[in-house]
A protein has these predicted regions:
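Short beta-strand segments
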Residues: 7-9, 58, 109-112, 142-146, ...
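Conserved core of the sugar-phosphate nucleotidyltransferase
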Residues: 120-242, 262, 312, 336
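Left-handed beta-helix
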Residues: 204-348
Length: 348
């Protein structure tokens, strides 16, 4: 199989301000304090699934240098610069049409750059199973995460019929928007609702033909760009035509409309790390429930906090319960965890 991985890395991670900024968003930051940024961890978990020369990154023009620095093994021609943000459907089309130019039978995994996976061995097993399923078929597979709680922050995939040929794979009945708490609790009890991780697997022939049916405007634009890939005209063509794409997610453009959509439910310790609270739940905690990333953090009479600081700063905290304390460069945030939905407001 000619396997390829497309890493989507154009977001700005505004909910993780001040650690994540428009100049250096969270996918390029060592969020976990492990010595690797989230995009580096994303690439690492696909080692063994495909070689680095078959990995692709789609990102904003202003992050190209950061990607080159953090992922030097990925060829420069595989780092694709979006002239402007147009959501995930044009982002994915950009990568898949370019891959198809030199790899017409490529099997592709599309993944966000800023999620966390704990069990990388199980992750690879699941992804490789999906790749085998899509290699010689017109199927699209999405990885569904088995829910561990009634989560209101994720969209859901509803599984329908189990395949007779592979008991791990199901047809998809529907995609659901982020639910309220009562609905999320119902989903958890139903047993056939899975978190939408935004990880998709398909053959490049399949996605290009499906987009011609369900997202013809975007497909036509990339059909026009296609002859210019790998030529001196490529950058000019992208800058001229990419901004004319409709701004739409791959879920709305394709996944909710196409016919042969399947879900492969999985459990590999996935989190999209969308909030400070989610990060606190994944980091090691002291006996008082405090999670810390930094080299010199001292807490006194404090509990249930998350502290994230740059390496050279000494931080001393006394008497706080349930707070975010985050410092980067010349900015310090001190905010109640229960009020973290207001961080976008604070960062303006």
């Amino acid at each position: 199989m000619d396997n390829h991985v497309v890493i989507m890395a154009g977001g700005i991670g505004s909910r993780f301000w001040p650690m994540s900024t428009p100049e250096c968003p969270k996918q390029f930051i060592d969020v976990m304090g492990c010595g690797r940024s989230l995009i580096q961890l994303t690439a690492d978990r696909f080692d063994g699934v495909c070689p680095r020369e078959n990995m692709w990154v789609v990102t904003s023009e202003k992050y190209i240098d950061i990607v080159r620095e953090q992922l030097p093994e990925i060829p420069e021609s595989n780092i694709l610069a979006e002239p402007c943000a147009r959501n995930t459907a044009p982002c994915i089309a950009f990568a898949c049409w370019k891959i198809k130019k030199k790899h017409p039978n490529a099997n592709v995994v599309v993944t966000p750059s800023d999620a966390l996976v704990i069990d990388t061995g199980e992750f690879r097993r699941v992804v490789e199973k999906a790749l085998r399923f899509t290699d010689d078929s017109s199927a699209i597979v999405t990885i569904g995460i088995r829910p561990t709680r009634a989560e209101t922050g994720y969209g859901y995939i509803v599984a329908a019929d189990q395949l007779q040929t592979d008991k791990e794979i199901f047809t998809v009945d529907a995609f659901k928007e982020k639910p309220d708490k009562e609905t999320a609790e119902k989903y958890l009890l139903e047993g056939n609702y899975f978190w939408n991780a935004g990880i998709f697997v398909w053959n490049v022939r399949t996605i290009t033909s499906v987009m011609r049916v369900y997202a013809p405007g975007i497909a036509q634009i990339f059909d026009r760009i296609f002859p210019d890939f790998y030529t001196e005209k490529e950058n000019e063509s992208i800058k001229k035509l990419f901004p004319t794409c409709e701004s739409i997610s791959i879920d709305y453009a394709v996944m909710e409309k196409a016919q042969e959509i399947y879900v492969l439910p999985a459990s590999f310790g996935w989190s999209d790390l969308g909030t400070w609270g989610a990060l606190r739940g994944l980091l090691p905690q002291d006996k008082s429930g405090n999670a810390m990333v930094g080299t010199d953090i001292r807490l006194y009479e404090s509990k249930n906090c998350i502290v994230h600081t740059s390496e050279e700063k000494r931080v001393v905290i006394q008497g706080l319960d349930g707070y975010i304390i985050a410092e980067k460069d010349d900015t310090l945030l001190i905010c109640k965890l229960e009020e973290e939905q207001r961080i976008k407001e604070f960062s303006k």
